[in-house]
Amino acid sequence: MTESMADFFPEATLVNIAVAPYHFSEVVVQHYNSLLCLSKLLSAVHGVFIFENEVAQDLCRSMRRINRPTLDDINQTMSSNILPVLLPKFRGGGPCQRHSCLSNDIADLCPHPQYKFLDVKHTPQTADASVEFTFDSWSALLKNIEYMQAAGTASETHASRQRFGANKPANYVNMSSLLILRGLGASEAASECITSMRSSRSIRHAVWSDTGDYYSVCTSPFYVNGYQRSMTLVSNGQTIVPYLQRLLMKATEMFRVGAYLHQYTAVNGDLQVDDFVDSFRSLGQTLQDYRSLGS
């Protein structure tokens, strides 16, 4: 369907949201499905927002205090993370302030056709009953975002464990980043947040980018998800590497012994072995490109 839309609307900016399946599930061919899907999306769209079921479920339990999250709870958590990216927002301030549309955001976040995977981190995230009592300062929200980015996780709980634990944060390198501030005093706080990030080098960018710290920033005075202040970081960088490594390793193990290929080549008849080879080559090259951001 996405390929058809790309054919019908060649000038449009196309963006997809892909949800990575659980690491262990009852669907034995999930790694094949993810491989084929992501490799096709890379050639058809301008950007792909990646979410993981495991991370969303952990957010439900650790941050929203839902002991037994349902599918609706998990979907709501993902939706609340992507919502600040899609809602109207502005760039600049004063008379230079202008509306920032999604196509502009994607152009900044994905300036190279080989780098299209986008990661979203959002704070705060609390239990529903605590939302109206949450009044984090902009500096506190920025610290949360920095810890989450350094740890490569969308969960504040996991970021805190790495911060105070024995394991050193991975400190992933980005190609580009978009920081979104929404709520009370967002426009006034934007420049201070960017200055703080640049001075601390808390969010790293590839050495070959124009300034070495390729940020875009958007603001909106309106609340989102009920919070007086909230902050979202969209990054295009190495946080995707662990997932791609795991996906390619599992899919390669199955492909090497020919496991379940008949379900695609014989039963459905729409795919051939060469299609798998092309997908491995495409996603493998993408993984290598993201790894090279840090070199």
Question: Which residues does each PLM region occupy?
Answer:
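Terminal, contiguous helix-loop blocks that mediate binding/assembly
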Residues: 1-295
